[in-house]
A protein has these predicted regions:
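Conserved SAM/AdoMet-binding glycine-rich loop
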Residues: 78-80, 87, 92, 190-314, ...
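Conserved, mostly hydrophobic/aromatic
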Residues: 181, 198, 234, 262, ...
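Conserved beta-strand core positions
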Residues: 6, 43-44, 149, 196, ...
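Proteins enriched for Cys/Gly/acidic motifs involved in redox and nucleic-acid/cofactor modification
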Residues: 1-206, 245, 256, 260, ...
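Terminal RNA-binding accessory module
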Residues: 346-444
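Active-site proximal loops enriched in glycine and acidic residues that flank catalytic Cys/His/Asp
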Residues: 200, 236, 264-266, 302-306, ...
Length: 444
């Protein structure tokens, strides 16, 4: 298999990307060459997502598109893994004959075996119990292309929200042992990674299964000891599970970004109850107020679901008022997607798609105004910015501050004729604001 060219298509979330990078590491160690050409690829791997309807459609389209190269191209192995592979294991093999191998979400460490079997003339399927964690010892391949990387600290989820299929596809919550995470982080830091973004289905309760109590604060303290790292960012924090030691560590450790991603989903108590969320509107207000009192400069991001079954005009209006009052720095909105096998999909009073889209647009229009106002308040402030690249044909660079998570938030555009290198940190005085981005110049 030496020098076989492999194309990897990683769909969906950042957690899926981490799995893809681990698989790539194993394959590169065994002589595979990475390519971005469908025509040249001898092995094509699609790491799929099916969290919502649109993600499922994207996965199907990619599989069917790559199947063409399996039929009439260089491709000798077409392999499908990820959440769609776990959920529709039999359908994929039976209905798409071009697919040679299917690996479940907890079986991606068998990718080398799968390729070997297919090259030997067999089709391959592997679905491990959703209990332990896949084990790949090879060095992970960093694919983000910048100076940040994701560190997946746990797999699975125990929440069982009524709209979500993830616990069925990823299994119960399993933390990655701390020593493994530290070793992985050190390796990435040696590859010029300066920002680590901690991800999981939920990061807040990291370690509860291994150490008997939430231990994210202890992990943060260990990661902060890695000299080459500048920023450590936390995504996917459930508000009800944020605990005092975590907040105290964020305050004490300068490398930990004053940034939290809190996926609240809604603010009406009845909707939250039927979603299976373990919090209330007042508890959300109290937690947000607490975080802002402890860290006045904290950036809060959230995600919402609009059009949940039975959501009334009044409940939607309540959500709008809540968002207006809370002034989240960053916000994303999904329209509710009924997922087969979830309690919410069987609920009465499903909302029309047009109504969902209208409500989503209302929320995003409100957030756009909030974001523009918050940006205006930033004018005159000085921020530390990590340069990510140059703006084409202009004396300007694009970067991010601690308030900007990669891939989902805005940018800081830095006007300067001075040459800068990706990964540089510069102090920037903010001189202007767009709806989601800031403009500044290097402080003198």
């Amino acid at each position: 298999m030496n020098n076989m060219k492999i194309l990897f298509i990683s769909l969906g979330c950042d957690k899926n990307l981490v799995d893809s990078e681990h698989m790539l590491g194993l394959l590169v160690e065994h002589g595979f060459e990475i390519t971005d050409s469908e025509e040249d690829a001898e092995v094509i791997v699609i790491n799929t997502c099916c969290f919502i309807h649109d993600a499922k459609e994207e996965s199907i389209q990619n599989i069917l598109e790559m199947a063409k190269y399996r039929t009439a191209g260089s491709c000798k192995v077409l392999l499908v893994t990820g959440c769609m592979a776990e959920r529709y294991r039999d359908e994929i093999i039976e209905e798409i004959p071009e697919v040679d191998a299917v690996l479940g979400t907890n079986s991606y460490d068998k990718i080398l075996d799968a390729i070997q079997d297919v090259l030997g003339g067999d089709r391959f399927q592997e679905y491990a119990d959703l209990k332990g964690l896949p084990k790949i010892d090879a060095q992970r391949v960093v694919t983000t292309g910048g100076h940040y990387e994701y560190l997946k600290i746990a797999e699975g989820c125990d929440k069982h929200c009524t709209y979500c299929i993830i616990p069925k596809l990823r299994g119960p919550y399993r933390s990655v042992p701390m020593e493994e995470l530290i070793a992985e982080a050190k390796t990435m830091a040696e590859q010029s990674v300066k920002e680590l973004v901690l991800v999981a289905q939920e990061t807040t309760i990291y370690g509860i299964d291994l150490y008997g109590k939430p231990s994210l604060h202890l992990l943060l303290k260990e990661l902060c000891k890695i000299q080459e790292l500048y920023w450590i960012r936390i995504l996917y924090c459930y508000p009800e599970d944020i605990y005092p030691e975590l907040v105290q560590t964020m305050k004490e450790e300068p490398k930990v970004c004053h940034y939290l991603d809190l996926p609240i989903q809604h603010a009406n108590d009845e909707i939250l109850r039927r979603m299976g969320r373990r919090t209330s509107k007042q508890e959300l207000i109290d937690k947000i107020d607490f975080l802002r009192s402890e860290m006045p400069d904290i950036t809060l991001r959230t995600t919402l679901i609009t059009g949940f079954p039975g959501e009334t005009k009044e409940q939607h209006k309540e959500l709008l008022e809540f968002i207006n009052d809370m002034e989240f720095d960053r916000l994303g909105v999904f329209t509710y997607s009924p997922e087969e096998g979830t309690p919410a999909a069987a609920m009465e009073h499903q909302i029309d798609e047009e109504v969902k889209l209208d409500r989503q647009a209302e929320l995003m229009e409100l957030q756009q105004d909030i974001s523009a106002e918050l940006g205006e308040r930033r004018i005159g402030q000085e921020l530390l910015v990590m340069i990510e690249g140059k703006v084409a044909d202009e004396d300007a660079y694009v970067g991010r501050s601690q308030a900007d998570a990669p891939g989902v938030d805005g940018y800081v555009f830095v006007n300067t004729p001075e040459a800068r290198v990706s990964g540089d940190f510069v102090r920037v005085k903010i001189t202007g604001a767009l709806e989601y981005d800031l403009i500044g110049e290097i402080s003198q």
